[in-house]
Amino acid sequence: MIDWVDRNTYMERLWALEGTRDIKVITGMRRSGKFELMKAFSASVARKDPSSNNVYIDLLDLDNEPLLEYYVLHHEIIERHKEGARNRLFIDEVQLCEGFEKAINSIHARGGWDIYLTGSYAFLLSSDLVTLFTGCHREVHILPFSFGEYRSYFGEQGAADDEFAGSYDYDDISESYGFLRRGRIGTERRSRGTRSESGAPR
């Protein structure tokens, strides 16, 4: 198993939005990789622009518990701004800060920050984002691993057909897709066990 799978589609989307005025919000279901994506993107921009001021705040970290108050979060962000530098703000699980939109909207109105947030889709629906950020946002919605990403993550290098449910040797390779077409594995003659007319196994 490897540490990280390049999710190029989402990384390219973030790079396309990099430096824009809008608040960038990464949404998705639990365990879909929001945290890892933003962490990878923040590391990427830091390598590309080493002189920039990249502030990363993980609100799941107990060290940041005081920042769960929106006015404390607001003050912290202001204090960490550097004049003359390219300032980027990354906040993970922003919905944990009650009233976070007050802090973020204020920082956005002040200018001087390129803002990226992650949040659970259970708390940050698309309709909510429009209300929270008055339309000044761009949503990047991510999904859990695709089949190909799953195989890459676990270092699977074999044939993709081997990963189908009930995979074993077939007389005809087309039979391996029976599960997808009919909702069962293989064909009747390849079923595991033969049944009598009554339906009982022989």
Language model regions located:
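Pre-Walker A adenine-sensing motif
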Residues: 2-19
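Hydrophobic anchor at the beta1->P-loop junction of P-loop NTPases
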Residues: 26
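P-loop (Walker A) phosphate-binding loop of NTP-binding proteins
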Residues: 29
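Conserved lysine of the Walker
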Residues: 34
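Hydrophobic positions on the alpha1 helix immediately C-terminal to the Walker A/P-loop
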Residues: 37, 41
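Short glycine-rich substrate-engagement loop in P-loop NTPases that contacts/grips substrate
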Residues: 55-87
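Structural recognition of the conserved hydrophobic beta-strand(s) that form the central parallel beta-sheet
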Residues: 114-120, 141
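Interdomain motor-coupling "hinge/lid" segment immediately C-terminal to the ATP-binding subdomain
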Residues: 127-202
